[in-house]
Amino acid sequence: MRFHTLLFLSFLLLVSCALICTAQHPGLEKSGMFHENVGKGQHIEEKRSCIERMQTCGVEAGLPCCSGAPCICPYIGDCICIQ
């Protein structure tokens, strides 16, 4: 019985870590998404003129930050607009 409890708690720990990771790095989810217009090479970001604060602003988007701030790229994770 203790083994099953330990196994269940380990599973809950892994699931909670995965949920926290996707909450902190929403770009990881977006990279795996498929869109209806993939054949045209368009992305959702291309329909906007700029990227809002704390949204991803990587090279693939090619759009400036709305505030004029630079797109900051950490060592690990998505590039974001900071202001």
Curated annotation (Swiss-Prot):
Expression (tissue specificity): Expressed by the venom gland.
Signal sequence annotation: 1-23
UniProt subcellular location: Secreted
Zinc-finger as UniProt keyword: no
Disulfide bridge partners, by residue number: C50-C66, C57-C71, C65-C79
Residue ranges the record assigns to the propeptide: 24-48
Keyword Calcium annotated: no
Protein name: U25-theraphotoxin-Cg1b
